[in-house]
Amino acid sequence: MAQLETRTEPMVVNFGPHHPSMHGVLRLVVTLDGENVIDCEPVIGYLHRGMEKIAENRTNVMYVPYVSRMDYAAGMFYEAIVVNAPERLANIPVPKRASYIRVLMLELNRIANHLLWLGPFLADVGAQTPFFYIFREREMIYDLWEAATGQRLINNNFFRIGGVACDLPYGWLEKCIDFCDWFGPKIDEYEKLITNNPIFRKRIEGLGTIERDQAINWSLSGPMLRASGVSWDLRKVDSYECYDDFDWQIASEKEGDCYARYRVRVEEMRQSLSIIRQACKMIPGGPTENLEAQRMATEDKKSEIFGIDYQYVAKKVAPTFKIPNGELYTRLESGKGEIGVFIQGNNEVTPWRFKIRAADLNNLQILPHILKGAKIADIMAILGSIDVIMGSVDR
């Protein structure tokens, strides 16, 4: 009796670049054997805009508004790194108050980044309701940004060499503390709804597992690295800005799967809330209205209340600021991982070389490796757990 041949030829399927779960214009060329993924080739570059070459033809003041369009979920981080590089190359001091304001903006952006990851990730695995919850919380962060910078999501244009563009408006710190008081219980609601949900856990536990050594060898960073058991956070390692002044813990897990990456990001939101609370209480000079009242009540212009640490910018940099000769790599911890800038100056107003390291580009490189052997239905869950923004990947 003749037996039927059950072996089939591999099928090549294109996911994207316009698939709703692609998180941007990413194309995956996936080779399937039935339901099993046997190969995957990411195709990137659809959103390339030449951001590095633009940087090499603009002064720093002109370039800051551009960078929030790269990672439009985390524009503040790119603003920070773009001004940090020439600051360190030129040894420009940053007032303590300005550093605290920067930390407040960065941690608010970290929460906003993780919220915008959480909603679409849960939608990818079939839970639609939390997608609407996260925008309720993000609106409050947008309101805080709008009050401080004039813009909501991108084009904040708030960071400057030597500090920030302006001081915080009256009542801003109180509104920020109100947000912390309101958002803390919301994280508990998320955990109650999601974390121990048996359907959610069965859907993503064990998916996309990355071992500790793999995470290090693939140069992963951020939650992708910390979910694999590596407690590495540049806020602790490099101690940039004023993070040493605060008491907080690095969020990490050991399992290395999609569920561990979810747990890390939720815990990071809690830690960011803690940092924001501490920064609001410890900021030099306190609220802007109190600082101005103290200055008006003090006749001695040599008082410490007029000192550099109580200013929002060390000295406003001229549009003709020249980047000194030399080269430097500087980095910081964004919501997605390590973003960095290699800058090479030649004593001109524009840099000779401006190289940007995007965290999600490095994190995306491991995708073909962890997709092999997975089911076709798990592709979107694994991709969603990485957290990529294609504007940042392609630049």
From Swiss-Prot:
EC top class, as a word: translocase
Subcellular location, record wording: Cellular thylakoid membrane
EC code: 7.1.1.-
Predominant location: membrane
Signal peptide stretch: none
Membrane topology, from the record: Peripheral membrane protein
One Pfam family per UniProt: Complex1_49kDa
Any Gene Ontology CC annotation: plasma membrane-derived thylakoid membrane
A GO biological process held by the record: photosynthesis, light reaction
PROSITE patterns: COMPLEX1_49K
Catalysed reactions, as listed in the record: a plastoquinone + NADH + (n+1) H(+)(in) = a plastoquinol + NAD(+) + n H(+)(out); a plastoquinone + NADPH + (n+1) H(+)(in) = a plastoquinol + NADP(+) + n H(+)(out)
GO molecular-function terms, A-Z: NAD binding; oxidoreductase activity, acting on NAD(P)H, quinone or similar compound as acceptor; quinone binding
SUPFAM superfamilies for the chain: HydB/Nqo4-like
Keywords: Membrane, NAD, NADP, Plastoquinone, Quinone, Thylakoid, Translocase, Transport
Physiological role: NDH-1 shuttles electrons from an unknown electron donor, via FMN and iron-sulfur (Fe-S) centers, to quinones in the respiratory and/or the photosynthetic chain. The immediate electron acceptor for the enzyme in this species is believed to be plastoquinone. Couples the redox reaction to proton translocation, and thus conserves the redox energy in a proton gradient. Cyanobacterial NDH-1 also plays a role in inorganic carbon-concentration.
Cited PANTHER family: NADH DEHYDROGENASE [UBIQUINONE] IRON-SULFUR PROTEIN 2, MITOCHONDRIAL (PTHR11993:SF10), NADH-UBIQUINONE OXIDOREDUCTASE 49 KDA SUBUNIT (PTHR11993)
Quaternary structure, from the entry: NDH-1 can be composed of about 15 different subunits; different subcomplexes with different compositions have been identified which probably have different functions.
Family annotation (HAMAP family): NDH1_NuoD
Family, per entry: Belongs to the complex I 49 kDa subunit family.
The protein's name: NAD(P)H-quinone oxidoreductase subunit H
Organism: Prochlorococcus marinus (strain MIT 9312)
Lineage, opening ranks: Bacteria, Bacillati, Cyanobacteriota, Cyanophyceae, Synechococcales
Gene: ndhH
